């Protein structure tokens, strides 16, 4: 393996790219094995591992691509450049964290930060990552290179001015962009477009340019109404910037996983590209996280190498192709290597790789795109026109993903059902069969069918208090709840309400929620045991209403073309005792059948079995509930006649304090 600066690549002035105009493109690459010294202190496995950049470099070499690029040596960032976006205290902390004087404190410091590990190689790697992006950006802005890819780690887009978080120590892209704008005015870079296609919102980058009209920040990410990392409202489409920077911050927040090429390209074609054309940047930075790639263990999305190559190719229309890619996330080694190769081939202006069969965006994707356009159109006239009905009705229904317990027979049945559902043909009102879920108008036929079936919805959390539950049925908001619920399509109240006790463990976890703010929310272990007892309030509602409650609980829209939980799924959990995971990786994605009451299935929704293990290990935090949330549970237990106030408080305290 050749190292950065060795003879594997061309030197400045040499080139072997395709012809662009009257000359050939010079594509820069930076890679340094030294950045692999940043690792977990105890050698434990971690998704942000050194092999992430090794496999990319090896892939580029094996494909003969790195040999056709200009390979630059890495460079350490200067403190004065880091302090363009970071506080002096933060820079000093990262600088000193790998010294022997900090050996005994390093783990304690990391434990106080959000999703950070530190070791003796962390400081040098962080300085090299930021400095290398600065160096590459300077070469591109000077015209010595046309574009380039900095294969660096640790990543940067989560790092804020005074805080390391989300695997990020310095905000590499923000440092480099600020360097060009503030330290090299002679280069004539006055407007910078930063595109962040990492599956997680670039919260750090957004905050650093929040009031700066020189930087247009565009982030497309899983958001799920603030439930996906980094949790909160920062990634919402209403966050558009402030003061002179108002309108220069654009978020495209997916409300579910499974988004793929069609969804991302729709966001490009109907938001990013028209705005970029108006903005007319001088340089483009790309926070190139590949964790939205297919098979990524953290992202849950389905972007292919072809999808990344097309997105990048569309951006090369602007800034005379002056694009600087900086690696962010991406945790499937095969996906990150293939996606990186596809992007470098585009930079060299090679022919794009063959793409997958044509597909349509999810119907939820069009809703997000329309909401973003409506919010931003006052700043960007190109977004003012409404999208055509014909366009937005080229869509795919929200996906349904089935999982099961470890029982192989049940797992086969679940997969078989998924296969059958994927082959369904849907008849539209005109009688035309639409294959592969390419439906036209939103169908309501499933609602009529599911409205005929009753189920018991068993609540163990805030929905035990009936006024709170009715928000999911009739819409509205109760005291302490920070969001307004849209309600169900059928707003009929529950036909009956009863209380039961079930042998499942109640616990509270997660850092915060959109509905209740900072503090844990209630979950039950999907598996029963002989020790624990959980009080649940059972509401008799229709299966149609249950779908709408399930959708709202998991941040999905209720006006879906297809049910999240249909009659086949009900039969599956009823007969086989399976667990159905509907919205992938959602907090309450598991539907569990607890038995029957008067021959009517009792259904509850909770976390997955794998999530329980993550709660136990500490990967997902156990947290006591917020006061308003706990009070809602207590009111439900008391007003429902289940417990006295003192008993209810003791019940909640026990669930909080008892180890999982």
Curated annotation (Swiss-Prot):
Active site: 158 (proton donor/acceptor)
Cofactor binding comment, as recorded: Binds 1 zinc ion per subunit.
Region (Histone deacetylase): 26-349
Biological processes annotated in GO: flower development; negative regulation of gene expression, epigenetic; regulation of timing of transition from vegetative to reproductive phase
Record entry for activity regulation: Inhibited by trichostatin A (TSA), a well-known histone deacetylase inhibitor.
Cofactor: Zn(2+)
Primary localization: nucleus
Assembly description: Interacts with HDA6.
Job of this protein: Responsible for the deacetylation of lysine residues on the N-terminal part of the core histones (H2A, H2B, H3 and H4). Histone deacetylation gives a tag for epigenetic repression and plays an important role in transcriptional regulation, cell cycle progression and developmental events. Histone deacetylases act via the formation of large multiprotein complexes. Involved in the regulation of flowering time by repressing FLC and AGL27/MAF1 expression. Forms a histone deacetylase complex with HDA6, FLD and MSI4/FVE that represses FLC gene expression to control flowering time.
Protein family membership: Belongs to the histone deacetylase family. HD type 2 subfamily.
Protein name: Histone deacetylase 5
Naturally occurring in which organism (per UniProt): Arabidopsis thaliana
Gene: HDA5
